[in-house]
Amino acid sequence: PEKPQYEGIHAIVAPSASFAADDGSIALNGNSASNVARLLSHTGHSIIKGMGEMQITDAEYKEIKEFTDKLVSNNNTPTEIYQTIFRWITTNIQYQSGYVDNNPYPVFKTHQAICQGYANLLNVMLHTQDIPAMNANGMLVPVGGHAWNYVYLDDWYVSDPTNNGHFRMSELDTYTHLVPMTLDVDLFEDEEFVYHFSEERLNIRQVKKSGKQLIVPFGTNGFRVSAFNPSKPLPEGVEEIYIGQNIESLGENLLGLSIHAPNVKHAFVDSANSKLKSYGQVVYRDSQPYYIPAAATVIQFLPIHTFGKNFLKDHAHVETIVIQSGTKSLDAYAFENCPRLQKAYIPEETVVDAKAFYGVHPQFQILRGIVKN
């Protein structure tokens, strides 16, 4: 017999004019260290307005400043002050492989730290002397994860107090073992967005204001933006996100949109984007679902071999899902704690575990057949 066909469920397609156009911004296609050097050479040291997200009280800071003032009392230039502080840290702080508190004050008092503690203390001590510095986190080749600093004296320098390393930033060949992935300062800011360097990309860290439709910018200050992974909540009115051809990542380890965009119903990706694509409210990367808007009510999926456990969990708004032909199976608890989910359109040939839908609407039903868009 002919298979049932359901009509009236359409995948919304955004017009191409909705996306940010190529504004000629420069793509950061070099290695990570060269990209950071390019960005910092452009921004200058005025971007450093504090100590990042350092955990330190006013009393702790005051004590470190009083000590540092005495330590550098015979120094006259920023370079001399930096050298004295750097020498004191590399001489007096001992690397401790076990657990230690790496906030700057405990490091200052106990003289024990791992790399993060070294970088934190150098950052704070330089800050007490009005010398611009920031923390960098990334990789120490071939060892693994590492933290160090960028410092501005007469020029930008790369400072690795853990390993007694000091390099001019422009001399990239001298510190190829340091691969920066994240900086703890904002690089650019305008009326709508705040940008920083994260996960080796120029990223939009914050959306300051937007209407219902959020158009992700193509570039800023002449540099192409390649990531949109906010670390602060989007404005409440944002319901639609338009992701242009420039965006390659929404986050590697943690998608900020999954946390900070509770009211987004639709996410669209420019068809010219070679890394991401969108269909039926879902953003895909490498043919796998990557981001599902938290307020989407109808979600259509491209064919996926298997919907595994917790494929979609704790989605408060979805009411209808559509599974396409080519999907082999839905495992137990594939869709869990989706209290408004009432309908699932699933091809007849797709195997569905008896517990594939758990914690859904009391009137939930599976409709077998073909969905005509």
Named regions from a protein language model:
Residues 117-181:
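Hydrophobic/aromatic-rich core segments of domains that either
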Residues 45-108:
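Secondary-structure boundary elements
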Residues 192-199, 209-226, 234-249, 257-281, ...:
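Structural signature of tandem-repeat unit edges
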Residues 151-154, 207, 285-286:
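Active-site beta-strand termini and strand-to-loop segments that position acidic
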Residues 81-85, 89, 111-126:
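Active-site nucleophilic cysteine motif
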